[in-house]
Swiss-Prot record:
Gene Ontology MF: a single term: ATP binding
The keyword DNA repair is annotated on this UniProt entry: yes
UniProt keyword list: DNA damage, DNA repair
Chain's gene name: mutL
Protein role: This protein is involved in the repair of mismatches in DNA. It is required for dam-dependent methyl-directed DNA mismatch repair. May act as a 'molecular matchmaker', a protein that promotes the formation of a stable complex between two or more DNA-binding proteins in an ATP-dependent manner without itself being part of a final effector complex.
Protein name per UniProt: DNA mismatch repair protein MutL
PROSITE patterns for this protein: DNA_MISMATCH_REPAIR_1
HAMAP family in alphabetical order: DNA_mis_repair
Family: Belongs to the DNA mismatch repair MutL/HexB family.
Gene Ontology cellular component list: mismatch repair complex
Organism: Streptococcus mutans serotype c (strain ATCC 700610 / UA159)
Length: 651
């Protein structure tokens, strides 16, 4: 008897469902994508108990003809592709014909559909993949799919479900991203009878952003646009003052499909450069139109990973689109808004001074700042970075080799109290620094307001006035920016001549990194780093380039190897620019340091000559601005509608 058998169709569908259907959100994604492919203009998603009890998706699309209804539940039955060459010009969201049979195999599925050219519609009921009923019915044009008792015959899958709130959050995230990908479609999401999401479907991406994130956020989104012969990039990005603590608010779309792509995420951050604080991420919707021949979507069951030809050119296009758009914006943060944001943060406690004023006298419209209430602020009491102990000399007598030094990864230090938000691991910080350096090198000259200095507070903040109102400058951040640009400009071409080491260094790597570095060793050789094999997963360095100081060898080699593993290239300028960031931080004036008038005015003059005077190299704001209108609002000289009290006859 043969040991190899063909699996029953129901079992095969359940196995396929394990790849495609991970949770209720996966069902929602597949059904809504089918509705989008059917040219729907309205899609309603109704769920109960976060989709575990019921998911119902209703659309007004083309519908399914009666002859095709049963075929739609067969594996690999699809109307999207017909021959092999079609795989290279896919423009629909679905094409494999796996989703519907996979869903039907692990639930009770009810499908009602009708097309424009048929008198009657069709009702189909399947339970666990087996068709129980098919009949003609009267139903509106379009399709309604109901999925009940999800995972009823695969209880092991239910064990891995999180809370109802967590599963609901995944569903909302799916609908939000599909809404941003298709602003021309009106989406409605209802959970347990309560409407959670609703978009207008007018084709305006900014309007879709307002429907998902709120009007206040949509107003702070900046449009971007760029194109070349292969790609068209458009979308919206948030101003640098509007950030999140993770990448979840970055949406990348290719031909209307939401994808995940590490390199494109990096390109977005590169476009911001030092305008973002370290560890903060923007809200962004990047819509990329591309010839289907340049994108392969058939590489992952969920189709969220896409292989892109000419990926480096696309990265440059995205980065330049963002940088060009931000260059046109006024990037001095509004001080009144920041004051409202920090004052509502309950995690920080401040000593309060009693004033003979009622609390209600301070005028803020806090509803306008609701978006910021959920942000977390790290206390200045964050622990400082520590330095790893220096390497220990170890004598190796094998094969007559001289003494060698085992290299250790070291962490550069900076006065962390001057950057209370930079409480990151060494690896995270290096990645962030690498990310901003490229844009720091290419910054263009910005216009800076003409300021008149008139005072200092607590040896930390400088006060100046200009046509735009009152400006408050962080003296450490200001001098850090000035010194960074000074050190950066001193970085030029370096001498790759080599110098012999008296004591060679040994560098150990994980096995996978070691093999990758072996393949790419020629790239390291180009910048004067010559590593030789020395035992298992270990390289030995016997000489170093003259431009690299011996005390920097350990950290420099590890950092350049990390750079090579991450980006497939090594840039000496990039590495030296990271040093410039550290040097500017350590050698700048600190808080509680009193400046005389001459030094303060000179600092403002130097700041005005910087290419980017608005942010320190770490992304913190250098100055904030109180406009005259802000001051008048704080002192109640104008009302909410900006009507002057003098005009009202009350002053």
């Amino acid at each position: 008897m043969s040991k190899i058998i063909e699996l029953p169709e129901v079992l095969a569908n359940q196995i396929a469902a394990g790849e495609v259907i991970e949770r209720p959100a996966s069902v929602v994604k597949e059904l809504v994508e089918n509705a989008i492919d059917a040219d729907s203009s309205q899609i309603t998603i109704e769920i109960e108990e976060s989709g575990l009890k019921k998911i119902q998706v209703t659309d007004n699309g083309q519908g399914i003809e009666q002859a095709d209804v049963i075929m739609s539940l067969r594996r690999h039955a699809t109307s999207k592709i017909k021959k092999q060459s079609d795989l290279f010009r896919i423009r629909t969201l679905g094409f494999r014909g796996e989703a519907l049979p996979s869903i039907a195999s692990i639930s009770r599925l009810t499908l009602k559909t009708a097309t424009k050219g048929e008198i009657y519609g069709t009702l189909l009921i399947a339970n666990g993949g087996k068709i129980e009923k098919e009949e003609a019915i009267s139903t509106p044009i379009g399709t309604k799919v109901s999925v009940e008792n999800l995972f009823f015959n695969t209880p092991a899958r239910l064990k891995y479900m999180k809370s109802l709130q967590a599963e609901l959050a995944h569903i909302i995230d799916v609908i939000n991203r599909l809404s941003l990908a298709h602003p021309e479609i009106a989406f409605t999401l209802i959970n347990d009878g309560r409407e959670l999401t609703k978009t207008a479907g007018k084709g305006d991406l900014r309007q879709a952003l307002a429907g998902i994130y709120g009007v206040t956020i949509a107003k702070k989104m900046v449009e971007i646009s760029n194109a070349d012969l292969d790609f068209e990039v458009s979308g919206y990005i948030s101003l640098p003052e509007l950030t999140r603590a993770n990448r979840n608010y970055i949406t990348i779309l290719i031909n209307g499909r939401y994808i995940k792509n590490f390199l494109l995420n990096r390109a977005i951050l590169d476009g911001y450069g030092s305008k973002l604080m370290v560890g903060r991420f923007p809200i962004a919707v990047i819509d990329i139109q591309i010839d289907p021949y340049l994108a392969d979507v058939n590489v992952h069951p969920t189709k969220q990973e896409v292989r892109i030809s000419k990926e480096k050119e696309l990265m440059n296009l995205v980065s330049s689109a963002i940088a060009d758009s931000l260059r046109e914006q006024e990037l001095i943060p509004d001080a009144l808004e920041n004051l409202a944001k920090t004052s509502t943060n309950k995690k920080q406690k401040f000593e309060q001074t009693q004033l003979p004023l009622k609390q209600s006298n301070l005028y803020y419209d806090k509803t306008q700042n609701d978006f910021f209430l959920k942000e977390t602020t790290v206390s200045e009491a964050s622990s400082e970075f520590t330095v790893v102990d220096k390497a220990v000399n170890i004598t190796d007598n094998v094969s007559g080799h001289s003494s060698v030094k085992y290299a250790q990864r070291q962490m550069r230090t900076c006065e962390n109290k001057e950057h209370p938000s930079l409480t990151m691991t060494d690896k995270q910080q290096k990645r962030q620094l690498s990310r901003i350096v490229e844009s720091l090198e290419n910054e263009e000259k910005s216009t800076f307001p003409e300021l008149e200095y008139f005072g200092q507070m607590h040896g930390t903040y400088l006060f100046a006035q200009g046509e735009g109102g009152l400006y408050i400058i962080d003296q450490h951040a200001a001098q850090e920016r000035v010194k960074y640009e000074y050190y950066r400009d001193k970085i030029g071409e370096v001498d790759n001549s080599l110098q012999q080491l008296l004591v060679p260094y040994l560098f150990e790597f994980p096995a996978n990194d070691f093999m990758t570095l072996q393949e790419k060793m020629s790239i390291l050789n180009e910048v004067g780093i010559h590593l030789e094999n020395y035992g298992e997963n270990t390289f030995i360095l016997r000489e170093h380039p003259i431009w690299l100081q011996e005390k920097e060898i350990e950290s420099a080699v590890y950092e350049m190897c990390d750079m090579l593993l991450l980006t497939n290239e090594v840039s000496i300028k990039k590495y030296r620019a990271e040093l410039a960031i550290m040097m500017s931080c350590k050698r700048s004036i600190k808080a509680n340091h009193t400046l005389d008038d001459y030094s303060a005015r000179n600092l403002l003059i130097q700041l005005s000559q910087c290419k980017n005077p608005y942010n320190c190299p770490h992304g913190r704001p250098v100055l904030v601005n109180f406009t005259k209108a802000d001051m008048e609002k704080m002192f109640r000289r104008i009302q909410e509608n900006h009507t002057s009290l003098r005009e009202l006859g009350k002053y």
